[in-house]
């Protein structure tokens, strides 16, 4: 029997191959990074170059789900559009029903449940996306969650998905400290530094979004990102000079 064709059938050694293939699709997608700061959550995405005549504003990997929640994704954009639309409708339905916005975990659990249903339904295939979902709860606590095609979800302090996820995650494991997220600017710089591990052409190929408590999602413009990149480069040069002085 061909176990990689049937979505709902396990192989003898316990694999659901279609789910694993969906996870492979994510590894070919743009790198996305999420970091939870003290009073801020930051999402950064590697921007792929667009065609000369294409409007790059139509190519977004970061989007708002509600006033207090947004997400970034890696994988198939068409699949992500379906998940995003379903999640937005659920946010609106929740607001109409209980007259309050969703918590970040609630909408993450909804997205994870939607993905899980597509792993055991005939005539469907798993969603080929992984998502980083960030936002603020009622008490002002910043949250960061990650979901994958199997329907699992976990809370994180910082995480990465997409083709460069391994390198970026290793960088974050080494550099994520309380001091590194002490201020909003430091948190933003940490995300940019993490993305620069896999993005070669500097700030022009980075999409960055920040969310603060009781404030709408803000997408940073290229000039703002370039300013941060210039500061990071300057800090690197100063550190190199200090090392050279110590060595001499």
UniProtKB/Swiss-Prot annotation:
InterPro entries referenced in this protein's UniProt entry, alphabetically: Ntn_hydrolases_N (IPR029055), Proteasome_alpha (IPR050115), Proteasome_alpha-type (IPR023332), Proteasome_asu_N (IPR000426), Proteasome_sua/b (IPR001353)
Listed SMART domains: Proteasome_A_N (SM00948)
Gene Ontology CC terms: cytoplasm; nucleus; proteasome core complex; proteasome core complex, alpha-subunit complex
Pfam families per the UniProt record, alphabetical: Proteasome, Proteasome_A_N
Localization annotation: Cytoplasm; Nucleus
Keywords tagged on the record: Cytoplasm, Glycoprotein, Nucleus, Phosphoprotein, Proteasome
SUPFAM superfamilies according to UniProt: N-terminal nucleophile aminohydrolases (Ntn hydrolases) (SSF56235)
Main location: cytoplasm
Positions bearing Phosphotyrosine: 153
Superkingdom of source: Eukaryota
Glycosylated residues in this chain: 130
NCBIfam families: PRK03996.1
Subunit field text: The 26S proteasome consists of a 20S proteasome core and two 19S regulatory subunits. The 20S proteasome core is a barrel-shaped complex made of 28 subunits that are arranged in four stacked rings. The two outer rings are each formed by seven alpha subunits, and the two inner rings are formed by seven beta subunits. The proteolytic activity is exerted by three beta-subunits PSMB5, PSMB6 and PSMB7. PSMA7 interacts directly with the PSMG1-PSMG2 heterodimer which promotes 20S proteasome assembly. Interacts with HIF1A. Interacts with RAB7A. Interacts with PRKN. Interacts with ABL1 and ABL2.
Family: Belongs to the peptidase T1A family.
Protein name: Proteasome subunit alpha type-7
Organism of origin: Pongo abelii
UniProt lineage: Eukaryota, Metazoa, Chordata, Craniata, Vertebrata
């Amino acid at each position: 029997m061909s176990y990689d064709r049937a979505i709902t059938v396990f192989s003898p050694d316990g694999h659901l191959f279609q789910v694993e293939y969906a996870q492979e699709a994510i590894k070919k997608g743009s790198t996305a990074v999420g970091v939870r700061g003290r009073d801020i959550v930051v999402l950064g995405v590697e921007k792929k170059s667009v065609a000369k005549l294409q409007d790059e504003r139509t190519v977004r990997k970061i989007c708002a789900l509600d006033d207090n929640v947004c997400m970034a994704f890696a994988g198939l954009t068409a699949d992500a559009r379906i998940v995003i639309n379903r999640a937005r409708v659920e946010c609106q339905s929740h607001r109409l029903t209980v007259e309050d916005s969703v918590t970040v975990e609630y909408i993450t659990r909804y997205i994870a449940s939607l993905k899980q249903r597509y792993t055991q339904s005939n005539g469907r295939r798993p969603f080929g996306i992984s998502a980083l979902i960030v936002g603020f709860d009622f008490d002002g606590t910043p949250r960061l969650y990650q979901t994958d095609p199997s329907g699992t979800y976990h809370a994180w302090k910082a995480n990465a998905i997409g083709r460069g996820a391994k390198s970026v995650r290793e960088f974050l494991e080494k550099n994520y400290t309380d001091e590194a997220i002490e201020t909003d600017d430091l948190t933003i710089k940490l995300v940019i530094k993490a993305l620069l591990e896999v993005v070669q052409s500097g700030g022009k190929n980075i999409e960055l979004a920040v969310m603060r408590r009781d404030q709408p999602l803000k997408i940073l413009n290229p000039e703002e990102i370039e300013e941060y990149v210039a500061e990071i480069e300057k800090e690197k040069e100063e550190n190199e000079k200090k090392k050279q002085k110590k060595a001499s």
